Regions:
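Extracytosolic ligand-binding ectodomains
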Residues: 2-9, 19-384
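Repetitive helical segments and hydrophobic/amphipathic motifs
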Residues: 12-14
Length: 384
């Protein structure tokens, strides 16, 4: 640990000159529908409230040894506001000096904030919205620290291919996000020539006419498959699926084996220290969205320290360059892809209490960077 700290100090002292103070903003939504569980009647266990500004504060603290050595003071400006106030709040934060903003927002709100700040001197980090459409929008002042849907679905596809589970039954819920999740998985499956044997919608409405749409035995019958992929972003239906399908097959997607950027049970590459520190300081288990915010703040501080006379434009250029080498406690150095601003990172495939596989899966290679086997590669990417 002492050697690592001295290495950080030497790197900081060798870094080019920069402003002696910087303010990093963290903008989130009060009553974010992704974190608020309003279906208590369903007897779901409600987890502790997700407050990702905790992760932002921890990132600032984690790097304080380095920033102190470099003479940089980092201030965190964390705000949670109603949806109607997001655009104005973002503009006010930038106007008062927070030129670097980490966004913990749903996809539509990320777009609204990006549009409101168009032309402003700001660098936005979309930390938690996975929609691929945000990447293909190619906002010049934005990068994405959290993984895209396609990146996560590619991890599933690699794992299924490595296990020779080639035939997949896809079940899709009624929530608008469910269809997008199923579409992303289908694209990943097609990329690796997996077969979608059928795509079947399910419903939670318990009416006789919906019998085939809410009966698990019927939904999973009359077809052969190696695995079931379920797209159920709220989880009300999917929780009943494991051990109840017509055939004894694994379940992946929204339950069973899930994909994410982080898991508290990950034990390699210094991950236990990250998770334990978060648990101790917040009293809850770290989630993927927490890591996404933590690495976003860590990215920004690293960029600011390493760029002469740092500006949002020059910091983004550094983050998406080969010079950027970020430690995320995942065993490889991380940086952002220049064509879509997406953070290159491994994806963890995990159950509720164990990490089963880390993607890219061994055997999948790329001509320049193995991490680019996940997500839309440069040759297939286009701004839209």
């Amino acid at each position: 640990m002492i050697r690592i700290r001295w290495a950080l100090v030497l790197a900081a002292l060798a870094a080019p000159a920069f402003a002696d103070a910087v303010r990093i903003g963290h903008l989130s939504l009060t009553k974010d529908p992704r974190y608020v569980q309003d279906w208590g009647y369903a007897r779901l266990i409600a987890p502790p409230p997700v407050i990702t500004s905790d992760a932002a504060r921890i990132a600032v603290t984690d790097l304080q040894f380095t920033t102190d050595a470099a003479g940089l003071t980092v201030t965190l400006d964390a705000r949670a506001v109603a949806e109607a106030e997001l655009a104005a709040t973002a503009q006010q934060m930038v106007a008062t000096g927070a030129s670097y903003l980490v966004l913990d927002l749903p996809g539509a709100d990320v777009k609204a904030v990006a549009d409101a700040l168009k032309g402003q001197p700001a660098l936005l980090v979309n930390a938690t919205a996975p929609e691929d459409v945000l990447r293909s929008a190619c906002y010049p002042g934005m990068v994405h620290s959290g993984p895209s849907q396609r990146r996560q679905m590619d991890a599933f596809a690699q794992y299924l291919r490595s296990m020779n589970w080639e035939n997949v039954l896809v079940l899709v819920g009624e929530h608008p996000d469910d269809a997008g999740l199923a579409d992303a998985f289908t694209a990943s499956a097609e990329r690796l020539r997996l077969t979608i044997v059928d795509r079947r919608p399910f419903t939670l409405v318990a009416a006789p006419q919906n019998r085939e749409g809410n009966n698990i035995r019927l939904l999973t019958g009359d077809v052969d498959y190696d695995v079931v992929f379920v797209a159920d972003t709220r989880g009300e239906f999917a929780r009943y699926l494991p051990y109840a399908a017509q055939q004894p097959r694994p379940v992946i997607g929204s339950v069973g084996l899930t994909a994410g950027s982080w898991h508290w049970a990950f034990e390699r590459d210094g991950a236990t220290q990250v998770s334990s520190r978060f648990d101790k300081l917040t009293g809850r288990k770290i989630q993927s969205v927490d890591w996404d915010v933590w690495i976003a703040v860590k990215s920004l501080i690293s960029g600011i320290i390493n760029v002469p006379a740092a500006t949002p434009v020059s910091v983004r250029a550094f983050l998406t360059s080969d010079k950027m080498k970020l430690d995320g406690s995942k065993g490889v150095t991380l940086n952002y892809r220049p064509w879509d601003g997406q953070l290159r990172q491994p994806i963890l495939l995990a159950t509720s209490d164990a990490v089963i596989m880390v993607a890219p899966v061994q055997g999948f290679t790329h001509q320049t960077n193995t991490l680019d086997t996940l997500g839309a590669d440069e040759a297939e990417f286009a701004c839209r």
